[in-house]
Structures are given as structure tokens and as C-alpha cells.
Amino acid sequence: MLLSKKIAVEINIAGCKLKQYTAAMLRQHNIDLTPEQFLLIDLLWNQGPMSQLDIADQMQKDKNSITKLVDAIERKGYVVRQQNPNDRRSNTIVLTELGNSLKDDAKTKGIFILNNMLDGIPESELNSFLETLDKLCSNMTISDREL
């Protein structure tokens, strides 16, 4: 198998395993969120209220996927949509009291989950891995001249 193909396959497998592992660990720690829902709520904890468009940009997802994610966590009572006073066509996603109440416990458990995943890997290797991932992502950014 070509090295480039092997790398692409391994990145895909790692992404799938990350979602499966995180979902299982969230369930095990009684956090009623999918990994993507957790990431969205974590984004709101860190950034504050955001438009769905900004969330889509930050999470690298299309608007329809974000709408479904917001719908799901809104049904659970973690967020509400508030109409943007400056643009009636857009909504701002705001954490509810329930959404904010998860923060300390969920962040602590989230850090524990991630630390378990990285257990036994030296920090120098993790830093090299991050540098390589950054380069891969840069190479995969589509510019106007490539279209």
C-alpha cells in the first residue's frame, strides 16, 4: 500500500476510534452527550454565546450538521436559541443554566478521558504529532487557485 494511502486510512481509523472511545467514556461517566455535542457545549463554555454560523466555522461542519447538533442539545435543555437583535435571520446559541451546570464536572471528566487516551505517550512525541497534523491540515486547505 502506498504510504500516502496508508496514512489516509490510519487517520480515518483514528478518527473513528476517537469518536467511539469518547462516546463510551462519556456514557461510562454518565455524561448524556455525544462527543460532538460535548465539543459544541465546550465551545460555548469557552467562547460564550455564538451564532450557528460561527459554531459551524469553529467545528469545521456544515450548517445543517450544526442545526441537528443544536436541536439535540436544545431538546436536552442545555442550550436555547435567541434571535440575533442585529440580524433577525440568525440565531445566537446560548447555554442554559443546566448547560452551564455541567461545566465543572464534565470538563474534569473530559480531561480525565483525554488523559487516559494519551497515557504512556511522551510529550515530545505528542508535540511532534501535533506539528505533523498541523502540516497535514495546511496541505488539505483548499485555496482558490486549486479549484
Question: Which residues does each PLM region occupy?
Answer:
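C-terminal regulatory/oligomerization modules of transcriptional regulators
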Residues: 1-2, 124-147
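Short alpha-helical "packing" element that flanks the helix-turn-helix/winged-helix DNA-binding module
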Residues: 40-41
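The alpha-helix within a helix-turn-helix
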Residues: 56
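Residues within helix-turn-helix
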Residues: 52-53, 64, 71, 91
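Short capping segments at the starts of secondary-structure elements
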Residues: 47-51
